[in-house]
Amino acid sequence: MLPENGRILCALVILFLIFSFAVASLPRNISTSSFQAGGSASLGKDVQEAKAKLQAGINTWDSELLKTARDLFINCLMKSKADNAYILYHIALADYRLIAFYLSSKMNDEAEKSLIEAQKYLEKCMALDPSFGEANALYGYLLGFEIALHPEKAMTLGPAGFNYFSKALAKEPENPRIHLLQGISLFYTPQEYGGGADKAMESLTKAVNLFEKEAIVDPFKPSWGKEEAYTYLAAAYKQKKNYEKAKELLKKALEVNPDFGLARKELSGLEKSS
């Protein structure tokens, strides 16, 4: 029979082996930041609920749903045991959607407030997880919104935005949302400043191809954008007057998300004009 000290040591060794096996068995696509947030099933469900609400707001272009989604992400952050890079990112993502809504509605003061909030949360996110390239890409896109609000800053913010996209791609070259955000940015950037439909098509085609391979399991990770990649690629083809290809891509966008209002509106317009 083992002496008392020997039995304690044996028990500790067994516990260590059990713990080591459990850690080795964890899915590799679950990030450290998910565990920092508590990694609980209930928090994961809360994040998924907030994501669904945000997507509903995007589908219908409803600012109240977008604001509700943001509040839900804030609640998730408050429930987490520590700051979580993915939750911080999603708060900024909700602000990004609100900025787009406010700018399209000529509500520049509201857009300015949301921009400040989005940048604040993304700066925290990037500091918490420097390897999270997608946060850099979203920050770069936000600088485009800042230029829209303050055109006099274009000479400094324009190159800064490209720099953030370069850093994002260096960190996560196979992330489809980085290519999507870059493609949208290039689509709205005049050709003489390095943008245009052709440049946008390169990034958006890459995004579409990467989205086809992506399978997100972790509920905390970003999972948006596939239908938008098809829709903006369609917009680039439309600008090049390739209307049949544009319609084909819009139909694919609606296969991904039948409720996506922008794709439905664009497809309806093309079908009426053809």
Question: What kind of feature is each model-predicted range?
Answer:
Residues 1-6:
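N-terminal secretory signal peptides that target proteins for export/translocation
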Residues 11-20:
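Bacterial N-terminal signal peptides
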Residues 83-84, 132, 175, 214, ...:
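Residue-level recognition of tetratricopeptide repeat
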Residues 23-100, 105:
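N-terminal leader/linker segments that initiate helical-solenoid repeat arrays
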Residues 49-68, 94-125, 131, 138-167, ...:
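Short coil/linker segments at helix-helix boundaries
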Residues 234-238:
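Outer membrane beta-barrel transmembrane domains
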Residues 86-87, 135, 178, 217, ...:
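TPR alpha-solenoid repeat register
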Residues 239, 248-274:
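A cross-kingdom marker for long, charged
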